[in-house]
Curated annotation (Swiss-Prot):
<dbReference type="InterPro" id="IPR020069">
    <property type="entry name" value="Ribosomal_bL9_C"/>
</dbReference>
<dbReference type="Pfam" id="PF01281">
    <property type="entry name" value="Ribosomal_L9_N"/>
</dbReference>
<dbReference type="Pfam" id="PF03948">
    <property type="entry name" value="Ribosomal_L9_C"/>
</dbReference>
<dbReference type="GO" id="GO:0019843">
    <property type="term" value="F:rRNA binding"/>
</dbReference>
<dbReference type="InterPro" id="IPR036935">
    <property type="entry name" value="Ribosomal_bL9_N_sf"/>
</dbReference>
<dbReference type="InterPro" id="IPR020070">
    <property type="entry name" value="Ribosomal_bL9_N"/>
</dbReference>
<dbReference type="GO" id="GO:0005840">
    <property type="term" value="C:ribosome"/>
</dbReference>
<keyword id="KW-0699">rRNA-binding</keyword>
<keyword id="KW-0689">Ribosomal protein</keyword>
<dbReference type="GO" id="GO:1990904">
    <property type="term" value="C:ribonucleoprotein complex"/>
</dbReference>
<dbReference type="InterPro" id="IPR009027">
    <property type="entry name" value="Ribosomal_bL9/RNase_H1_N"/>
</dbReference>
<keyword id="KW-0687">Ribonucleoprotein</keyword>
<dbReference type="InterPro" id="IPR020594">
    <property type="entry name" value="Ribosomal_bL9_bac/chp"/>
</dbReference>
<comment type="similarity">
    <text>Belongs to the bacterial ribosomal protein bL9 family.</text>
</comment>
<keyword id="KW-0694">RNA-binding</keyword>
<comment type="function">
    <text>Binds to the 23S rRNA.</text>
</comment>
<dbReference type="GO" id="GO:0006412">
    <property type="term" value="P:translation"/>
</dbReference>
Length: 150
């Protein structure tokens, strides 16, 4: 019997996959537990339409991430932050990714989740720092952060 998997089933199939399985296994376990449904023509067509729309949405997200990358990596894009510092150029405290995300939204109207800013450790010195930003699993940008004394 052909079934469409609704969830991942270990050792049998992944979500959205169409596979042949024994009739008893399909009816008594997979379909009964809601892990799969029978692969009728209508169900297969619905699945293909869903996969097509998912692919289009993923392509749109990728294009949007690339557009944001061009804005962030432009030469004139420098995120300015002010902080108190000592005489040796070290900050009193630090600048975390949340503060960078807030400044980016204020200065360039680019809203980013602070978790996308891959700051290995908070910035603790004055000057310019290149900070990687993971916009999409396939797109990573670098933004320049300039920390000046208050």
């Amino acid at each position: 019997m052909q079934v469409i998997f609704l969830n991942d089933v270990r050792g049998k199939g992944k979500r959205g996959q169409i596979k042949n399985v024994p009739d008893g296994y399909a009816q008594n376990f997979l379909i009964k537990k809601g892990l799969a449904k029978e692969a009728t023509k209508a169900a297969i067509n619905t699945l293909k339409a869903e996969q097509k729309s998912e692919a289009a949405r993923a392509a749109e997200e990728l294009a949007e991430a690339k557009q944001v990358k061009t804005v962030l990596e432009a030469d004139e894009t420098v995120v300015e932050l002010k902080a108190k510092a000592g005489t040796d150029g070290r900050l009193f405290g630090s600048i975390p990714s949340k503060q960078i995300a807030t400044a980016l939204a204020d200065q360039y109207q680019v809203k980013l989740d602070k978790r996308k800013i891959e700051l290995p450790e908070p910035i603790r010195v004055l000057g310019y720092t290149n900070v990687p930003v993971k916009l999409h699993p396939e797109v990573t940008a670098k933004i320049r952060v300039h920390v000046v004394e208050k």
